[in-house]
Amino acid sequence: MGGVSTARPVIGVLALQGGVAEHLTALERSGAEARPVRRPEELAQVHGLVLPGGESTAMTRLLDGFELFEPLRERLAAGMPAFGSCAGMVLLAGTVLDDRVEQDTPPVRPFGAIDMAVRRNAFGRQVDSFEADLDFAGVTDGPVHAVFIRAPWVDKVGADVRVLASVAPSGHGSEVTAPAGRIVAVQQGPVLATAFHPELVSGDERVHRYFVQTVRAS
């Protein structure tokens, strides 16, 4: 699609796994026309796309099965705005790191839309899920409450990547140390990614509004 010419952009949510309904609701409340996307022809009709959480290796297989992987790769390469949360962040990375990959698990094939290295499940497994309040660049009216579930973090970013939020280790993922805290939200051009799930915080659509504004400006 071409540039966004209306105040109400059409934003899709990749409807293969994760909190699809929650993302759709948050986008609608943020001023977008939100649509689920499962087919290439649906992808072609949106100005931007949300890649929700889930399991990144399974999502890669589902993208292949629904014949969406190549069309999505092409749209991202052409500059389509995108927002990935949790597993969606992993899929948008340039490099994926995983210390716990099992031998029979196929590797994640990331799209390389953001120049970053992301470590899968870095904060731990399901029992290590946690919540934190974060200062989020570009979002006003106080900190963002963030829900982390088997969350990744960003090990490193390229020069063109803006860090939007970080969280101190606080005992999570203590097998890897970093003095400056963990990067958990980034942006490169019109592509945004968070390690946490903003769609799970009812009544706070500020991160989604930030993405909708990004789509409008693209």
Swiss-Prot record:
GO terms for cellular component: cytosol; glutaminase complex. The keyword Transcription regulation does not apply. Its EC number is 4.3.3.6, 3.5.1.2. Pathway: Cofactor biosynthesis; pyridoxal 5'-phosphate biosynthesis. InterPro entries: Class_I_gatase-like, PdxT/SNO, PdxT/SNO_CS. CDD domains: GATase1_PB. Keywords: Glutamine amidotransferase, Hydrolase, Lyase, Pyridoxal phosphate. PROSITE patterns: PDXT_SNO_1 (PS01236), PDXT_SNO_2 (PS51130). One of its GO terms (biological process) is glutamine catabolic process. It catalyses: aldehydo-D-ribose 5-phosphate + D-glyceraldehyde 3-phosphate + L-glutamine = pyridoxal 5'-phosphate + L-glutamate + phosphate + 3 H2O + H(+); L-glutamine + H2O = L-glutamate + NH4(+). GO terms for molecular function: glutaminase activity; pyridoxal 5'-phosphate synthase (glutamine hydrolysing) activity. Disulfide bonds: none annotated. The active site is at 86 (nucleophile), 197 (charge relay system), 199 (charge relay system). L-glutamine binds at residues 54-56, 120, 149-150. In the presence of PdxS, forms a dodecamer of heterodimers. Only shows activity in the heterodimer. NCBIfam families: PLP_synth_Pdx2. Catalyzes the hydrolysis of glutamine to glutamate and ammonia as part of the biosynthesis of pyridoxal 5'-phosphate. The resulting ammonia molecule is channeled to the active site of PdxS. Belongs to the glutaminase PdxT/SNO family. This is Pyridoxal 5'-phosphate synthase subunit PdxT. It comes from Saccharopolyspora erythraea (strain ATCC 11635 / DSM 40517 / JCM 4748 / NBRC 13426 / NCIMB 8594 / NRRL 2338). The gene is pdxT.
